[in-house]
């Protein structure tokens, strides 16, 4: 089976009244996404629920949604996450004799060694296929804290530390967590990492890079955790300078390579896997780089296509 999983930082979604919900719904449906992980969700997902109820469901798609509590401090950096999935494809795990116990998504703030590390702890969901295949998807939604732009060095070090905890602690623990039915588990982390994958052609003012491959061992077995998606995903500021850390090309409207996917090819052996940024500004907004950041987001979505 093939699945398309999207990640989309919607930039203060639920807090900004100017969001074009029709256009956001058009993007989600037009890209045929089976699951979408959202970052920067405010108001306990009120805007996301409205998107589901008024702009997606009436188009004959069946979707479900879960929104996290807002985490962070109360000084404007507190935000939540959300998941939206096609209920024709996936469902939440159930247990109990009557299937009356459901594994609900949760904020990961109670794992040993991770408490207090994340400014905004990741949001974790398990999904089972509705038809075919004895497996489950385990998805980790994260928005690494950007930090105070006045203190670039410490802010970047914090981002890199949060990323290190994601790939060295959170991902392996979630990936190896046993559940009663012993389904094959396929685990993917995704979101806005606020860090770029290092490439020689990327000129990054602040050196906000991540390590693309992390190696770890369990007993005699060795594993890799790989972070993917090299395309630029954040839009330049209107004057193409602003506070972006990437050196934008004069011909480019994009600034940073911040949105990624992370998985282990050994423990999540997909038959096929690929990912890319979606050029939604050109495809859905007529190339209008003034309209898009004002009404949609300062990020474009990314998608990972997997075959199991």
Kindly label every feature range from the protein language model.
Residues 13-22, 29, 39, 44, ...:
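Extracytoplasmic low-complexity repetitive segments enriched in small/polar residues
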